[in-house]
Amino acid sequence: MSDARSSILASLRASRDAHPVETVASDFTVLREKRWGPAERLERVKRMMEAVHTEFVDATEQDWPAVVQAFLKDAGAKTVLYAPATEAGARLESSWADGGPELVRYDRPVDEFKEEMFTGIDAGITQTLGAIADTGSLVLWPSADEPRLLSLVPHIHIALLKADALYDTFWQVMTENRWAEGMPTNALLISGPSKTADIEQTLAYGVHGPKRLIVVVIR
């Protein structure tokens, strides 16, 4: 087996050396020129995401914690998981009023409160890197301070989107944020609540992840 393997690899190397492949530079002109106006970007994102059951709520930089709290109270949420080490988490802690859903800090390894996360958390709040007009997608950048489980496990995912953090294309997101120089373990592109058509090819939402995706547009 060893001789056969060596022979095959030697043959492949010889073929590669005898027929080198010329590298062709990529042409990103189409992506560079695909543009929408500022107002049109947000309307396009909303239209495309609402088509797959995403919900939108408007807020301002001053009142978004109160808007989120009121929305979750009306939705019947009892517990809200958040990342205390983030800027958004600090705002929640300082602004959260009594009488609303209970804030639950995500400041422990998941193994220490796995059961609570999967059975006792109603909503999770995350920041976003922005949204893409071309595809109608949110961009999440998970980190040690804000792990991806915040957006994947709770039944309701609250995503905070700053109205000026809008991009035309995924290519623009990657280039302007210099992804080539360093990426997290994973970046998430989210267009709506979880869905599947595995069962009799019937489309169903909220089967293996959040049942609702709420985008809070912060103007």
What positions do the PLM features span?
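The feature marks the mature, well-folded catalytic cores of soluble enzymes
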Residues: 1-219
